[in-house]
């Protein structure tokens, strides 16, 4: 058994009889049986793949990658999460049995990374979709940092109390947002259609007259409207 900061057992007698509680016994059994579901979308996941080799050998922590969320109790997200992928990620998290944990790996997963400035389709942080237990910053994080995150998660598991797990499971901490993306095409003369011209902007009181043109040149123009 790997060493943990706090002991799990109350005391050990000379007759090799261990006295403990059901809560500590449950935590001890889950320490060496974290089965992760690997949810990698970009380059950060390549760093996690190096943990499978003999140099780092994450099998010593009892990590057994699973391909089904119903057999996993840990999901490791690595890479950019788009709005189209968000419902699938939430569905995978909801299908995992309880108790379950989440590790957010990389800057793109935590904050959206370099895509969070002007991208309309990037989720600004996976914690807006599912609760995160350990944040692992970096672009990308090193394999040693991934092992450190797993160690910190195991310490958190060793301190858990059964009553706290029940209360946290009753809370609805994850949510989804329906994003509708509409595409309207203008005429080839550079003028928007009549419906768009008749609409008044939400931040201004003046109306746009149908005779006004947004573009003076003749080209094919597309109007993108993102409705939250």
Curated annotation (Swiss-Prot):
InterPro entries: NADH_UbQ_OxRdtase-like_20kDa, NADH_UQ_OxRdtase_20Kd_su. One of its GO terms (biological process) is electron transport coupled proton transport. It is a peripheral membrane protein. Keywords: 4Fe-4S, Chloroplast, Iron, Iron-sulfur, Membrane, Metal-binding, NAD, NADP, Plastid, Plastoquinone, Quinone, Thylakoid, Translocase, Transport. Binds 1 [4Fe-4S] cluster. The keyword Lyase does not apply. Its cofactor is [4Fe-4S] cluster. It is an enzyme of class 7 (translocase). Belongs to the complex I 20 kDa subunit family. NDH is composed of at least 16 different subunits, 5 of which are encoded in the nucleus. This is NAD(P)H-quinone oxidoreductase subunit K, chloroplastic.
């Amino acid at each position: 058994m790997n060493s943990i900061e706090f002991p799990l057992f109350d005391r050990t007698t000379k007759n090799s009889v261990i006295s403990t509680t059901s809560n500590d016994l449950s935590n001890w059994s889950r320490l060496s049986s974290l089965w992760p579901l690997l949810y990698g979308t970009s380059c950060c996941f390549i760093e996690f793949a190096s943990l499978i080799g003999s140099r780092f050998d994450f099998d010593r922590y009892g990590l057994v990658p699973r391909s089904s969320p119903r057999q996993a109790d840990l999901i490791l997200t690595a890479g950019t999460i788009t709005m189209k992928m968000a419902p699938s990620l939430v569905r995978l998290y909801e299908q995992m049995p309880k108790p379950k944990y989440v590790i957010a790996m990389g800057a793109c997963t935590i904050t959206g990374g370099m895509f969070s400035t002007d991208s309309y389709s990037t989720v600004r942080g996976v914690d807006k979709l599912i609760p995160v237990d350990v944040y692992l910053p970096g672009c990308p994080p090193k394999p040693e940092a991934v092992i450190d995150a797993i160690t910190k998660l195991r310490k958190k598991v060793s301190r858990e109390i059964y009553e706290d797990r029940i209360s946290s499971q009753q809370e609805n901490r994850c949510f989804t947002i329906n994003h509708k993306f509409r595409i309207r095409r203008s005429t080839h003369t550079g003028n928007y259609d009549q419906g768009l011209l008749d609409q008044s902007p939400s931040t201004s009181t003046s109306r746009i007259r149908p005779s006004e043109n947004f573009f003076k040149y003749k080209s094919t123009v597309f109007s993108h409207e993102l409705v939250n």
